[in-house]
């Protein structure tokens, strides 16, 4: 894959092909973002920086696709809201669905990109979250069932954070933090909890609630150890 995929998109834009093939992406150029978060300002420029960062970190096609489409909703932000993009995550997911159906994007790419589009803001802010919110975030990302994909989601978010003017060498502690939080969640012996629940006559949703509570306790205990460090 290309070392600097942005060059291909430059060519596609110059010849007018991008607005035909990927109009959802093409409309991002010229859309301003808040300079305190995005010194590069232009959403299209940011997108190319993210994509080039994904190439620099030698990511998979799945991660690169997620990077390409994570901010589609910013292209439909009402003009009177700019440069803020409130709710762009949900708009991105809706636009992504149509794009994937039109281009017949493989399921793995589509599902990973959908999570990144919906959750990248929450992942960026994960350093502010407590145990319960961290577990809910991991569950929404389906990180417990699909840990390898969860790591790709986190990598795409790192590319997003570092794909900004002046941030290309910045650390992204959120990735390690959420990976460690997932490890704490995975340490919970769910089969033991389910067996004990069955012995007590507890079934159905209550068992799920018990497992969720145990996961929150495990993450809370892990957070205490990180605070001590």
Model feature map: region roles:
Residues 1-157:
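Conserved, hydrophobic alpha-helical core segments of structured domains
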Residues 147-229:
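Charged substrate- and nucleic-acid-binding regions of tRNA-handling and nucleotidyl-transfer enzymes
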């Amino acid at each position: 894959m290309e070392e600097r995929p942005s060059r291909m998109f430059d060519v596609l834009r110059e010849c007018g092909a991008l607005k035909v093939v990927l109009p959802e992406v093409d409309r991002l150029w010229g859309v301003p973002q808040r300079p305190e978060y995005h010194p590069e300002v232009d959403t299209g420029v940011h997108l190319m920086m993210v994509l080039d960062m994904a190439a620099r970190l030698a990511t998979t096609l799945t991660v690169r696709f997620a990077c390409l489409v994570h901010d589609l909703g910013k292209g439909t932000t009402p003009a009177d809201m700019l440069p803020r993009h409130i709710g762009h995550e949900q708009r991105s997911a809706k636009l992504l669905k149509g794009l994937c159906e039109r281009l017949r994007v493989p399921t793995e790419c589509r599902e990973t990109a959908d999570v990144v589009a919906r959750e990248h803001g929450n992942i960026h802010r994960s350093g502010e979250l407590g145990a319960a919110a961290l577990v809910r975030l991991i569950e929404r990302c389906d990180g417990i069932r699909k840990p390898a994909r969860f790591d790709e989601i986190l990598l795409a978010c790192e590319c997003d954070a570092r794909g900004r003017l002046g941030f290309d060498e910045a650390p992204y502690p959120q990735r390690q933090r959420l990976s460690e939080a997932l490890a704490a969640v995975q340490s919970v012996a769910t089969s033991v909890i389910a067996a004990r629940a069955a012995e007590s006559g507890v079934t159905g949703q209550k068992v799920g609630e018990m497992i969720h509570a145990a996961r929150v306790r495990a993450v809370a205990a892990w957070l205490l150890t990180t605070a001590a460090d």
